[in-house]
Swiss-Prot record:
UniProt subcellular location: Mitochondrion inner membrane
The name this protein goes by in its record: MICOS complex subunit MIC12
Entry keywords, A to Z: Membrane, Mitochondrion, Mitochondrion inner membrane, Transmembrane, Transmembrane helix
Species lineage: Eukaryota, Fungi, Dikarya, Ascomycota, Saccharomycotina
Cystine crosslinks: none
Mode of membrane association: Single-pass membrane protein
Organism: Eremothecium gossypii (strain ATCC 10895 / CBS 109.51 / FGSC 9923 / NRRL Y-1056) (Yeast)
Gene for this chain: AIM5
One biological process term in Gene Ontology: cristae formation
Superkingdom, natural source: Eukaryota
Transmembrane segments: 7-23
Amino acid sequence: MPRLLRYGSFSVVASVLGASYYYYAVASPLYTEAEWHRVSQRTAALIDRRIDIPVPESTTERREYVVRSSKETMKDIWNEQIRSIVDWIYSWSH
């Protein structure tokens, strides 16, 4: 008898938890409007090849890149920070 009662109570608790999960998470608009649900659906569609992966268009415009050493870059960052600190200090005097 205790074994039957234990299995019966486990079944009832599992059924109640399953039903509450279904009605709260799956059947309600909270589930279908959630951001993680949209991401999950989009990921599944990408995997199943139902939608295409967006590819940015390439341009044929010429671009100029300036390559500098990390030493010069650090000096520029340092100077910018010093200038902003000095501006902040002088802003208190006005």
